[in-house]
From Swiss-Prot:
The keyword S-adenosyl-L-methionine applies. Its main location: cytoplasm. It comes from the Bacteria. InterPro entries: RNA_methyltr_RlmE, RNA_MeTrfase_FtsJ_dom, rRNA-MeTfrase_E, SAM-dependent_MTases_sf. It comes from Rhizobium etli (strain ATCC 51251 / DSM 11541 / JCM 21823 / NBRC 15573 / CFN 42). The active site is at residue 184. This is Ribosomal RNA large subunit methyltransferase E. SUPFAM superfamilies: S-adenosyl-L-methionine-dependent methyltransferases (SSF53335).
Amino acid sequence: MTKAPIAGNRTGRKLGQRVKNKKMKASSRQWLQRHINDPYVQRAQLEGYRARAAFKLLEIDEKYHILRGAKRIIDLGAAPGSWSQIAAKVTGSTDEDIRVAAIDFLEMAQLPGVWILQLDFLDPSAPGKLMEAVGGTPDLVISDMAAPTTGHHRTDHLRTMHLCEVAAHFAIEVLGEGGHFLTKTFQGGTERDLLAMLKQNFRQVVHVKPNSSRAESVEMFLLAKGFKGRKAEGDAEEA
């Protein structure tokens, strides 16, 4: 069971610690203070994960069991790599037998058992390179992609929803029957066409906000379970 972090740590730093730096902007100081006092950040450090985002995936899996039995996983928007760490462990991926392919336009340090591509996923060559690297049909496509924020809520929402749609189309093209798709989205409404497409192709579609996602954040996750297979999609188009 994924437990919420307790108010303490083994790093010698107490929760509630304040950041004192007069040269730092107030907003930056507040962000840093929140970050270093975040129990999920501290737990990630203790358990060897690259980011607190690991616990979002673990929480979702605890309820929906999307990692169980996964043999090949593709991770979109993977940097800094905490989801890829979990994926490599679950699949038993090694450098000799790669079963996890990850992509991000940001640089990402190497991980054992993970093939990493530094490239924008919107690049036309990205899907083919990922499929070649993962070495077979993936059981799970996970996406933590989000467009760089502009400060304009509607613009940020639309740009991130576009990434969700591209990731969803990719998942439908590559997943094996029974596979799952998980993507980050923002509160503010998921596009109807995207939801309709996912419901047409998957047996269960739900919105999820794990406890490890900050309460004040507009971040949510859209989970599509049980891919029906491309034959089902073709039948629907003919109908």
